[in-house]
């Protein structure tokens, strides 16, 4: 067989290593480096939309507002306005603009800054007569533009007719021969709102002299002008709305533009108050169309800034209050509100809102920032312009107007008009700066489906129409940009790459929509013409990288060949492979590609070309079989001196049979074609005889030199023997495909009756496993595969028990190295479907092979729990072997074992034999719990344990269980007592005794051990339980002496023991006197033992003082006939021989201290008694006062007359009587039987009812209880 070729770095090699250090063949999955790459970048997707609006516009805005808006400054206007006091408000139209002045006149200019007309606020032609000299607040124009109305800060309103012939007489004739500026007087003056702030002024309908006016008082009125008498124009008014409430104030009103519908013209009035926003229909009659409550956060704050704005077509109205905006959408057909949206709170207060067009809303904030919002997209900010640089007059909302998508600004120095520039202006600005890439990115942003600024930039809102406008300029600009980059000294890779990526994104999305725009592959080919030979490398590198990331899938044949030629000369095989795999092969130069693949041994790529170009999926398999069977001379594809790796055929077959294109790892499409290829290849691989090859010839594809030696299923056996691990890994992966389901209609016929299914392949493998001609390695791997496949696909694979015996015997009898883990996995997966007829022999085989995990499952299934437990105990690393801990396994075994059975006895023997081992591996606490649940008799095994500390810990845990004493041997209890006395500290012993119930015998046993250990405090506890209080007193006194001798001078500990001794003395009954004598005598003699300046002597002194006080207190609780008990005890103490032998001086000082303490205690007692007596006197008086207040009543009815005397249903006149008492006022006397008599027994009656029954005052008795008491009369 020929040698394999060199493994080039560029080849998509497949990792075929299967060994013990890596994956087993059951875990292996075929893959290629290319398939991994495709998985990480599967397909190109368009970049997400920029959240701040189109990227190009956002970039322009970042450079300043001048980038998006062009400004014109009109400076001559202000020189004219100076004579009239300066501007106060503005109203622009298409050909003229009107400016209100601070002296009251309204000036009309054209856009050449010529003053056209002066509107004078007077009804007379003489300007000196009754002219309003007040700043103009607002200006409005009627629908046909013939009449103008203005409101003033004084509350006056004037209307001018621009079509009248007469003018106001000038005060002086011009001397320079120039024509004087015409001046018009007002035709109507409304003074109903004088000294009131006007909050709304609009023309109503198509009328010339009808106005809707609102003011701060809350009134909204309609004024109608009409002529009377000598054609004099007068007006009348009608109130439309009056908001006059302390809780709700009118902020402003705004009339919509004229709405014409079905021969009817009308307006909608929007009204904003501090609590509501409403829409009112004014004709044919006034009616409320919509109302909503202003948000609570706004209601609860002071309204500083507010605004209302209507769109020109009346489809939307927006209003703002402080820093929140709301937009109401209205149906043009029936005026019904369609939706209402509310913005989140803005960071700063909003001065003014005005619609730029029907969709975009302009917002001016308090910091002079102008925002363009899109309310339909959650009030997204599309543009942000800084108007602070323009130095607007204050307040800016009065000097700023948006009309016909233009800005009109009154600044401190001039009048400015701003207009949005067109998209071509912005593009040209980029080009002039040499920023071609920025220009292309700007156009790309305008081609996005979501481009709300398109209309402002003079583009069509419709995406298709906008594409037609932009694609041709974009294409031409792209070519120019590419040419511009190339003309530089060195073509920059990054710039070319960025440019081409923009072109790729745009042309892929938009060029298909327009036949007039060349496709992307044409552009890329044209781009190649711009590069000189020295710069080709940069262009090819950019194109190759764009192809590699999946952005481009097709290029022209010319470019394809050029780029392949270039990288072939560079011998960059990796790029060649990526290009051929990633691009559409229809434009590929097949001859060139095949030659390169054969020259550089790009075997995977050669297979791909053969599949895609020739649509032939069988020839690669045939060639690979020729190579494996040493028939290289017959190869068509791999006919060179080098051969592909031997594992290539397994990866190729795996990909195809699982429906994936090799080596792309992408699904073969369409599905019908994929199914056909899979059927043909599966029929080929699993054919039972040699097939004809070529298929239209009479020649056959033999794997043996001698056709007579050709085996059945030749290709199956060839692949199995060539590399059994990879072949079985291939089968393991392809078995997961639905192709091999028995009920799949797409499976291929073999012969005419058999189908290539999992069952079919398993039958072939069973024959191969039984074939002794195969090596032991092949047979055991096949057996392992069969075992695992049966457990994975039980519904598709059926195998007889005899065949399973053969599988199991093959695995167990194998001597192949390195398959221990996988063999055990195979046997374990087979157990649910296999039952050995000779279980004992099977167990012996498993033991011989150390298949412990399998053996454990066998023991469980056979209920051999003793053997399972022994096996667990023999295993060193249980967690690694069984994937669980020993506690869980042991607990499981003991719970599953039937109580009282023979197996239960065997398990007990195993536990008894390995008791020490179980304690060390499971833990003492867990063992106690598990053994208690299984059998209490197991606890006796602790007696055989040599380590006493282990015994003590075990028994501690055991006897902490409630009611355990009656369930275990008494020897355990005795041992527990002995070990506790031996190993527990004195403090631990005391804690244990306090929490343990002991019998008398156990107490005596413990007492002996405690006395041996001189644990007097614990001994006192035992004596107290035995009611030997005199001995308990001795123990406590010995403990006190022991503490003093050992230097433990904690007074609180000593006093605690002494007080326990007091309690024992008092509990001693008849021995009480002797106990007290013993206690005091002991302390006196102990006092005499210590030197004068010893600390212990002082402690004894304190203890003696406490002892005498305890004795005195004990007297107070004794019987009355034992009044002399104290002196008897003291006499006996002083007569005691040990006291007599003490020094008189020591005894004198001691007794003086005792009596001083006694006197002090007596004085304290007297003071406390006095305090208690004084306090108790107050308490008694308070108690008596409470008693005199009366008693509660059990029932609400009088027991005699049955009427209500308390609670619900009481006569109402009683409340009047109560009021009379409270107010001390005279009242008409009414007999209400109000006095009530309440007895101590809680029964109540009317006083008159008792007297009617012959009871006398002060001698009342309860009629129910027949008892006399001092009743309470209320």
Curated annotation (Swiss-Prot):
Present with 736 molecules/cell in log phase SD medium. Coiled coil: none annotated. This is Vacuolar protein sorting-associated protein 8. One of its GO terms (biological process) is vesicle tethering. It comes from the Eukaryota. Its main location: Golgi. PROSITE patterns: CHCR (PS50236), ZF_RING_2 (PS50089). The lineage of its organism: Eukaryota, Fungi, Dikarya, Ascomycota, Saccharomycotina. WD repeats lie at residues 75-119, 131-170, 193-233.
């Amino acid at each position: 067989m020929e040698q394999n070729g060199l493994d080039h770095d560029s080849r998509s090699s497949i990792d075929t290593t299967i060994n013990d250090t890596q994956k087993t063949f059951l875990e292996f999955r075929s893959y290629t480096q290319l398939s991994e790459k495709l998985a990480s970048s599967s397909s190109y997707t368009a970049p997400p939309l920029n959240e701040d609006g189109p990227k190009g516009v956002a970039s322009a805005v970042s450079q300043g507002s001048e980038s998006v808006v062009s400004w014109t400054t009109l400076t001559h206007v202000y020189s004219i306005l100076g004579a009239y006091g300066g501007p106060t408000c503005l109203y622009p139209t298409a050909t003229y603009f009107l400016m209100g002045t601070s002296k009251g006149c309204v000036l009309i200019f054209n856009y050449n800054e010529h003053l056209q007309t002066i509107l004078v606020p007077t009804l007379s032609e003489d300007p000196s007569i009754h002219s309003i000299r007040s700043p103009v607040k607002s200006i409005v124009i009627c629908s046909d533009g013939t009449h103008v109305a203005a409101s003033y800060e004084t509350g006056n309103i004037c209307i001018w007719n621009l079509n009248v012939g007469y003018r106001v007489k000038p005060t002086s004739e011009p001397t320079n021969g120039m024509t004087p500026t015409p001046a018009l007087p007002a035709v109507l003056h409304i003074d109903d709102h004088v000294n009131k702030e006007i909050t709304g002024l609009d023309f109503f309908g198509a009328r010339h002299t009808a106005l809707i006016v609102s003011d701060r008082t809350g009134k909204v009125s309609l004024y109608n002008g009409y002529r009377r008498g000598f054609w004099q124009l007068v007006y009348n008014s009608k109130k439309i709305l009056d908001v006059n409430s302390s809780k709700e104030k009118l902020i402003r009103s705004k009339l919509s533009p004229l709405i014409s519908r079905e021969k009817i013209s009308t307006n909608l009035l929007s009204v904003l108050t501090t609590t509501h926003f409403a829409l009112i229909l004014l004709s044919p009659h006034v009616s409320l169309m919509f109302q909503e409550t202003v948000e609570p956060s706004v209601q609860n704050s002071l309204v500083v800034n507010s605004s209302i704005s209507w769109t020109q077509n009346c489809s939307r109205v927006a209003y703002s209050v402080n820093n929140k905006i709301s937009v109401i959408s209205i149906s043009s057909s029936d005026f019904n509100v369609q939706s209402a949206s509310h913005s989140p709170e803005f960071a700063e207060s909003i001065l003014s809102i005005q619609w730029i067009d029907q969709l975009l809303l302009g917002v001016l904030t308090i910091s002079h920032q102008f925002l363009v919002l899109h309310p339909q997209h959650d009030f997204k900010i599309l543009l942000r312009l800084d108007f602070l640089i323009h130095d607007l007059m204050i307040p800016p909302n009065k000097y700023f107007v948006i009309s016909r998508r233009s800005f009109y600004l009154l600044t401190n120095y001039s009048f400015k008009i701003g207009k949005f520039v067109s998209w071509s202006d912005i593009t040209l600005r980029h080009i002039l700066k040499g920023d071609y890439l920025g220009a292309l990115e700007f156009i790309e942003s305008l081609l996005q489906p979501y481009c709300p600024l398109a209309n402002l930039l003079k583009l069509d809102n419709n995406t298709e129409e906008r594409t037609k406008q932009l694609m041709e300029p974009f294409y031409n600009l792209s070519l120019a940009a590419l040419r511009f980059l190339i003309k530089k000294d060195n073509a920059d890779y990054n710039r070319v790459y960025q440019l081409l990526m923009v072109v790729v994104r745009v042309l892929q999305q938009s060029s298909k929509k327009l036949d007039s725009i060349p496709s992307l592959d044409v552009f890329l080919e044209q781009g190649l013409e711009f590069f000189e030979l020295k710069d080709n490398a940069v262009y090819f590198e950019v194109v190759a990288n764009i192809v590699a990331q999946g952005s481009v899938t097709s290029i022209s044949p010319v470019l394809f060949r050029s780029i392949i030629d270039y990288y072939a000369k560079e011998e960059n095989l990796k790029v060649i492979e990526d290009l051929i795999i990633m691009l559409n092969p229809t434009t590929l130069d097949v001859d060139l590609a095949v030659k390169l693949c054969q020259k550089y041994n790009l075997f995977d790529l050669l297979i791909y070309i053969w599949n895609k170009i020739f649509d032939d999926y069988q020839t690669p398999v045939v060639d690979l079989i020729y190579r494996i069977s040493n028939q290289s001379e017959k190869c068509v594809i791999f006919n060179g001196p080098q051969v592909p790796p031997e594992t290539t055929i397994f990866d190729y077959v795996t990909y195809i049979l699982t429906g994936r294109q090799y080596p792309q790892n992408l699904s073969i499409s369409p599905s019908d074609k994929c199914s056909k290829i899979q059927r043909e290849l599966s029929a080929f691989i699993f054919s039972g005889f040699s097939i004809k090859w070529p298929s239209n010839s009479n020649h056959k594809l033999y794997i043996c030199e001698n056709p007579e030696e050709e085996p059945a299923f030749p290709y199956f056996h060839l692949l199995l023997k060539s590399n059994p691990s990879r072949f079985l890994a291939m089968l393991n992966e392809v078995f997961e495909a639905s192709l091999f389901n028995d009920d799949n209609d797409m499976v291929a016929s073999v012969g005419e009756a058999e189908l290539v299914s999992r069952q079919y392949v398993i039958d072939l493998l069973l024959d191969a496993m039984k074939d002794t001609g195969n090596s032991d390695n092949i047979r055991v791997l096949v057996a392992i595969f069969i075992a695992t496949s049966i457990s994975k696909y039980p519904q598709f694979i059926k195998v007889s028990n005899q065949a399973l015996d053969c599988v199991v015997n093959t695995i167990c009898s194998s001597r192949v190295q390195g398959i221990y883990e996988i063999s055990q996995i195979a046997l374990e997966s087979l157990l649910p479907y296999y039952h050995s007829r000779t279980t004992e022999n099977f167990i012996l085989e498993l033991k011989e092979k150390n298949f412990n995990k399998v053996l454990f499952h066998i023991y469980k299934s056979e209920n051999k729990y003793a053997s399972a437990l022994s096996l667990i105990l023999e295993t060193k690393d249980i967690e690694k072997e069984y994937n669980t801990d020993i506690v869980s396994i042991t607990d499981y075994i003991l719970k599953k074992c039937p109580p009282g059975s023979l197996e239960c006895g065997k398990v007990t023997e195993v536990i008894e034999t390995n008791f020490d081992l179980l304690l060390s591996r499971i833990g003492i606490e867990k063992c106690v719990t598990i053994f208690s649940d299984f059998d209490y008799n197991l606890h006796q095994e602790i007696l055989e344990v040599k380590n006493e500390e282990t015994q003590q810990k075990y028994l501690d845990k055991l006897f902490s269980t409630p009611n355990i004493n009656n369930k275990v041997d008494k020897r355990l209890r005795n041992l527990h007592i002995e070990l506790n006395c031996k190993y527990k500290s004195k403090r631990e012993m005391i804690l244990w005794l306090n929490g343990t119930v002991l019998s008398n015998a156990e107490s005596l046993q413990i007492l002996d051990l405690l006395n041996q250990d001189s644990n007097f405090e614990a001994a006192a506890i035992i004596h107290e339980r035995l009611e030997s209080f005199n001995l308990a007193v001795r123990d406590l006194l010995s403990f006190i002496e022991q503490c003093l001798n050992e230097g433990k001078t904690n007074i609180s500990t000593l006093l605690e023991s002494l007080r326990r001794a007091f309690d024992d003395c008092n509990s001693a009954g008849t021995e009480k006197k002797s106990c007290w004598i013993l206690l005091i005598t002991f302390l006196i003699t102990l006092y005499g033992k210590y030197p004068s300046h010893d600390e212990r002597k002082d402690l004894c002194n304190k203890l003696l003082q406490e002892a005498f006080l305890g004795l005195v207190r004990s007297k107070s609780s004794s019987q009355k006939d034992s009044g002399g008990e104290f002196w008897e005890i003291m006499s006996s103490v002083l007569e005691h021989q040990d006291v007599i032998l003490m020094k008189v001086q020591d005894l004198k000082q001691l007794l003086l201290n005792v009596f001083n303490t006694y006197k002090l205690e007596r004085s304290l007692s007297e003071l406390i008694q006095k305090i208690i007596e004084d306090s108790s006197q107050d308490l008694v008086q308070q108690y008596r006062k409470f008693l005199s207040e009366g008693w509660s009543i059990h029932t609400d009815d009088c027991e005699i007359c049955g009427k209500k005397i308390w609670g619900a249903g009481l006569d109402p006149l009683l409340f009047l009587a109560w009021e009379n008492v409270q107010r001390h006022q005279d009242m008409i006397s009414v007999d209400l039987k109000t006095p009530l008599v309440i007895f101590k027994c809680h029964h109540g009656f009317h006083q008159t009812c008792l007297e009617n029954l012959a009871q006398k005052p002060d001698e009342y008795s309860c009629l129910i209880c027949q008892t006399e008491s001092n009743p309470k009369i209320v």
